[in-house]
Amino acid sequence: MNLRMVKSGLVLAFLAIAQWVPAQQAPQMEALPIDPNVRYGVLDNGLTYYVRHNETPKNRAEFHIAQKVGSILENEDQRGLAHFLEHMAFNGTEHFPGKTMLNYLENNGIKFGVDLNAYTGFDETVYRISNVPTQNQNLVDSCLLVLYDWACAISLNDKDIDEERGVIHEEWRTRADADWRTWEATVPVMFEGSQYANRMPIGTMEVVMNFPYQALRDYYHKWYRPDQQGIIVIGDFDADKMEAQIKELFGKIKMPENAAERIYYNVPDNKEPIFAFHKDKEAAYTRVDIYMKHDPMPREMRGTINGAITDYMNGVVGIMFNNRITEITQKPDAPFIAGAIFDGDFFVSKTKSAFTLIAVGKDNGAIDAIKGIMREAERIDRYGFTASEYDRARATMLSNYENLYKERNNRKNVDYAEEYIRHFIDGGYIPGIEMEYNLIKQMSPAITVDMVNQYVKSLISEDNMVISLTGPDKEGVTYPDKAQVLAAIKEVEAEEVAPYVDKVSNEPLISKEPVAGKVTKSVAGKKFGTTEWTLSNGAKVVLKPTDFKSDEITMLAVSKGGYSLYNTSDPTLALDLKSLNEVVELGGLGQFGKTDLMKVLAGKQVSSSFSLSEAQESVFASCATKDLETMMQLVYLTFTDLHRDDEAFAAWKEQSKAALVNYANTPQYIFSDSLSATLYNHNPLRRQMKAEDIDQISYDRILQIAKERTANAADYTFIFVGSFNTDSLKPYVEKYIASLPANKNREKVGKLIETQKGIINNNYNQPMETAKSTVYAIYSGDQKYDLRNYLMLSILDQVMDIVYTETIREEEGGTYGVGTMADFSPVDNSWLFLFGFDTNPQDEKRLTDRAHAELMKVVNEGPREKDFAKVKEYMLKKHAQNQRENSYWREIIRSNELGYGDNDTNYEETLNSITIDDMKAFSKKLFTGKDLIEVIMTGVEKAE
């Protein structure tokens, strides 16, 4: 497609800006072609399919079925059935009765909840089977058969339906927090007169617990049908054969006669602004959402050049607008804590779009937030964006697409699957990244800043406005009513709003060029296929070039020490330590504040950041290959010249206090605080931050600690992994790393914070709007860390996940899910295992007792053979996939360089050698019953 075609497309795009001309009046444009590497088709019965051969990851495939069906299609007495049906898809089908599907897939390394899952929305339901090993043709065929059964053969047995009612009721209980109640209160007002007003996917518990069995079957057979279904299969297989299989298998499904019309429910327009307000005793912040509604681009236009141009303009507008918002929040007394602006779907609807402004305010700061975010919209409406802002946004868009283009041969199966799901559900274009990149390169010079300004001004309007205001319900906090909100907006319109002044520095990143050092020694690493350099300043560099990605270089510099070298029992110092990672990022680097640095780096794929953890300090950086020297400059500055910005720190303090003042009253915060206090014996570093703590934080001390931790490059190992050439990297390493200050000191890890010993119970009542109990049990101890022990603890963790799903979730119907976590530290040989879940307070003790009993059964008897086999198969599959991940090798090398060994060498041999008897002996050694902490928050309904 040439520049002339793009310019002609612009004509249509600007017709579209005027709220979309009717399709019959608009000049017709051809749809962009579908990527020739995709097998796309529609069967005679109406079913759509997408098939693509792809080898990232190797020997793996994705199987998805997308349904243009969701809660929006429910009748009043069916509310919740779309979501209920999604659950039932995992409880028996024609070819996989009962739990045989789950068992079969898990036996092949496909883990439920990780590789096997689904979701239900207002207008869509999507199921997936991910990371399927394709070497096993029977497994591939079976995954297609699972999709077939989900399409037309879910069993829906009475007994299975009844058993799932409790699970969904507990899912509702888990989700019923302040955000959920806010949705339930505001959506009916925002969507008054539309089906969207009362179709939250979770439904009503009255329907969920009482609907007749046949109602679910009727809903299934009415809406799960070929014309609403898309099959998406991506992976390492023969695409010809896969396409033929799909045609044969899914072509058998009959399209129902006299099928019900799939209605896309409209959202009515409104001349007068709609105002939705809700306050909640557990809300953590004041938030305003302002929607300027407009009609969406017609589906038939989304797949043309018009759709691509509009997406481009939305992209650059979003970048420019949100950069301004970020700049505002860097200043003290900003009118809002955080903000965002974008154009897209009107909240949850597919049939109405909106230009959306979001601002999070302080207590009693709703009017300030509204005025602040509207003032920025007004500034754009009057003056538009500047040419220099647009140049940076355009460069960013081009850089993003360039990176995607360079990585076109490394794009993962799941990314293609998600793209094609959106194409099936929403329409649009999928011409392939080669064409998209060429389009962007042609569009960006053809679309001027004036065109972008004309476009964004068309989106800013008082007509069709919806305003949602939400926040905490507490004494001393008041909110404006609708009249006051509208008056505030009018006041902004009457203000003398000044145009935005774009201050851009032309100074170099580094004001004084460093004096380069040298690589004094180069040897081949003993494992991992690495090269090791010793630098003239004593720093060590480990290099692992890879071909896993074509345009990604990562660097991790690590050193022993961290918090452990400081007095973590000092309450004031602890505040500095735990806020350090946030605060050091506020100021930018060198002579550039954060906003200025963001402008200087526009169009570059590059970052560098410092962080401090309990046992190490680290600098992580990444870049596209073209930005390697820029990344190295940022690394140099991260070590030598953190920029101080007192205004940004003052703004951060204000925002942090405003955020914490309400969050500290939420049940989630209170439970987290109780858990950490109990687990770590009230250690100041582990306790949750409170609003009153913020003023005690010392910017001076934080910068001092950061400088101390980066003062000696010789105590660091610099690990490079990615798409680089060693010879090309060498001069940058010599200039920007070998030049770093260093000395002969070498630090070790100090004393780590320990978990409390003994049997400890912390059970307390917590008033809540919707009562639920949260249960956490933590077993801990000490054990020699090595690969074998690490693997056995990981196996136990994953086995218990299976056991708890089967018992606490499925048999008891007592919770949406039990979370498990195992942690094993190579630093001090400490381990812990925890399980946690939400439940009905009446079931709290019974389920807690059973959870302990199920764990001890596995400890004493060993895992069941079937569970043991499932977990090992998954671990072997995951390990094979990890072999081509840069992040995996970065972590393996990090652990090895710090002296903690590596979890890759002999992984498969060690895992395969572990037996059930080994598991039993190991578990008994760990779970002696001496050290167990239980924290239980029992919810009680708040008194009115």
Stretches found by the model and what they are:
Residues 160-228, 232-246, 255-264, 268-282:
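Hydrophobic, small-residue-rich alpha-helical packing segments that form membrane-like cores
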Residues 81-89, 317, 580:
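Active-site His/Glu-centered metal-binding helix of metallohydrolases
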Residues 153, 158, 165, 179, ...:
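Non-catalytic, conformational "gating/processing" segments within enzyme and secreted inhibitor domains
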Residues 1-10:
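Bacterial N-terminal signal peptides that target proteins for export
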Residues 23-51, 238-303, 307-322, 326, ...:
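Proteolytic maturation boundary segments
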Residues 50-52, 57-74, 81-82, 99-149, ...:
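M16 family metallopeptidases and their MPP-like homologs
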